[in-house]
Amino acid sequence: MQPVYIQRIASIHPQGNHSQGNNPKVNDSPDVSANRPFLQACEPDYKDIIANATLRRRMSRIVKMGVACGLECMGELSPEKIGGIITATGLGCLVDTEKFLNNLLDNEERMLNPTPFIQSTFNTIGAQIALIHQIHAYNMTYVHRGLSFESALLDAMMKIEEGSENILVGAMDEMTETSYIIQQRLGLLKGIEAGEGAQFFLLSREAGEHPLAEIRGLETFTGQHTTEEISSRIIRFLQRNGLECQDIQWLVTGKNKKQSLQGDYHEQITNSIYEELETNLFPESIHLSFKDECGEYPTASS
């Protein structure tokens, strides 16, 4: 697959870091996660990014996060040069979904306001970015749970290989108090610190003058695999790209490090696989977990 270059990055996530591309616009918002049981994204002043006050007022929180990230990531690039907008989400616009369902119950299925339903659809964010800049290019949204972002990234890389010059790809998910309570009752958050966030990347065919990074390859696989099978697939992936395990300087994983005496068995097994890979496959690499910064959510890998 042809190498792809990351030209700009925009991110809204917990701990007050809002990095936008090569010229970051940092918002010194206070950490809003202190009084919540999950990591909440610290949001910028949207007036500086989404100029239309009427449009901004109608947007839900996650829509504003995603649209702001997308617009900042585009920067000064002309809309005509965008070959596609590809977004990913695991659960979509939860606040609007909850609002619509509550109205459905409160009003006994009569005289419903359609706006929350319209805003709750998964493709809202990609569509809003396209409408704001009148981008008539390819527009796709992936809702593949934990593989949503990887699916969007793969699609973007394939579009560039087919001839597109620039692709805007992003991922976003939000956590609400209702969603947190439901997931907690279902036992999905044992030993896990929940989070949320929105990220966008401007990918291009050409390296340009100051690319942030180069993506040489991507591989995903699902299902139940032993540590040996996973190790074998990683080794083959590296070899296809002309690398060996000892060449890897940084190993960034999705290991959850929150300790719990009643931790989920599946999460313990997953963490044990990460630890075996760190010990046996990449012992000389620097080991990091991105979930320490953003928490756990379907598109946290972005």
Predicted ranges, named:
Residues 155:
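Internal active-site segments that recognize and position negatively charged phosphoryl groups
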Residues 1-138, 143-150, 158-164, 172-302:
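Conserved "HGTGT" condensation-loop signature of ketosynthase/thiolase-family condensing enzymes
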